A protein has these predicted regions:
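Amphipathic alpha-helical dimer-interface segment in Rossmann-like NAD(P)H-dependent oxidoreductases
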Residues: 79-84, 117-137, 173
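Rossmann-fold cofactor-recognition segment
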Residues: 56-69
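Conserved mid-core segment of classical short-chain dehydrogenase/reductases
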Residues: 72, 86-89, 95-112, 153-156
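N-terminal Rossmann NAD(P)H-binding glycine-rich loop of SDR-like oxidoreductase domains
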Residues: 26, 31-34
C-alpha cells in the first residue's frame, strides 16, 4: 500500500506576495494544486475549460485554451481580474494527450489545438501576467518526459511538449533575471489523461497495454500537486531557476518535500 505523503509545512515560503494563476485548474494536478495553494492562504485565479467550484480566495475563469478565440478571451478575462494587482506566480498545467495515433494521420485542426493548448497558451498567459509580476515572480511549466523523447502513438502530445520545452527556455531568456521560469515533470500521475491512454484498443494504440499494466505505479494527483507546490513556493530563487527540469522521481529532492517517515514508493516506469 502506498503511504500518504504530505510536504513539510514549516518550510519558509519563498514566493512573492500576490496572486497565483493556474491553468488546467478543474482536474488532475491543476485542481489539486489549487487546493494546496488555497489552504496555504494564497489567492488563486483558476483557468479551465469548465469553471472550478467557487471557493474563498478563488476566482474561477472558464475558457478554452486550445483555440485562438478562447485563448484571447482567457487573456482578456485574466487582465480584468488581475486589475493591476501583483501576480506572484503562473503555473501552466493545462494539457491533453489526445489526439492519439500516428502523427501523419492527425488533422490540421487537431494538431493546431494541441499546440495552442500546450505551447501557445503558456506564452500568451506569461505575456499577460509578466507586467504584473514583481521581481522574483515565478512561472512553472508542467512538462513530461515526452518533451525529451518520442513515444509511438503520442506524436501530437510529444510535439506539443517539445514545443513547451522550447517555450520554457525562450521565456527564461526573455524574462530573467526579474522573473524566473522553471519546468517540472510530475511523473506518471493518476489523472483522466491516464484513462485516455488506457482506453484505446491496443491494436490501434499499442502503448495502451503498457498503461493498463502500470496503474499500480501511478502517483496520486494530490501528491504530484504537493511536489509542484514545494517547487513553486519553497525552493530558493537560485534553485527554482535551475536549467534542468524538476523531476518528481529525483531521490535527492524527496527528503525536502516528504514528511519525516514517509516514503515515495512509486516506481519510475
Amino acid at each position: 500500500m502506498h503511504k500518504s505523503v504530505v510536504p513539510f509545512l514549516n518550510q519558509r515560503n519563498q514566493l512573492q506576495n500576490g496572486l497565483v494563476v493556474v491553468s488546467g485548474a478543474s482536474r488532475g494536478i491543476g485542481r489539486e494544486l489549487v487546493h494546496v495553494l488555497l489552504a496555504s492562504g494564497i489567492e488563486v485565479v483558476a483557468l479551465s475549460r469548465q469553471a472550478c467550484k467557487p471557493a474563498e480566495n478563488l476566482t474561477a475563469l472558464s475558457a478554452d485554451l486550445s483555440d485562438a478565440d478562447g485563448l484571447s478571451t482567457a487573456v482578456d478575462m485574466l487582465k480584468t481580474v488581475i486589475d493591476g494587482r501583483p501576480v506572484a506566480g503562473l503555473v501552466n498545467a493545462a494539457g491533453d494527450v489526445k489526439p492519439l495515433g500516428a502523427l501523419i494521420h492527425q488533422s490540421t485542426s487537431d494538431l493546431l489545438r494541441a499546440l495552442c493548448l500546450m505551447a501557445v497558451a503558456p506564452v500568451r498567459l506569461a505575456a499577460a501576467v509578466a507586467p504584473f509580476m514583481p521581481t522574483g515572480g515565478r512561472i512553472l511549466n508542467l512538462s513530461t518526459r515526452s518533451a525529451q523523447a518520442i513515444f509511438p502513438g503520442l506524436g501530437a502530445y510529444c510535439m506539443s511538449k517539445h514545443a513547451l520545452h522550447a517555450v520554457t527556455e525562450s521565456l527564461r531568456h526573455d524574462l530573467n533575471p526579474k522573473i524566473t521560469v522553471a519546468e517540472l515533470i510530475p511523473g506518471e500521475v493518476d489523472t483522466g489523461m491516464q484513462a485516455d491512454l488506457r482506453n484505446p484498443d491496443p491494436d490501434e494504440f499499442p502503448l495502451a497495454s503498457f498503461f493498463r499494466g502500470n496503474r499500480a505505479n501511478l502517483i496520486p494527483a494530490a501528491i504530484a500537486a504537493q511536489f509542484c507546490n514545494w517547487v513553486l513556493t519553497q525552493t530558493t530563487p537560485e534553485e527554482f531557476n535551475r536549467p534542468e527540469p524538476w523531476f518528481i522521481y529525483d531521490r535527492a529532492d524527496q527528503p525536502r518535500w516528504l514528511t519525516e517517515g514517509s516514503a515515495f514508493d512509486y516506481t519510475e516506469p
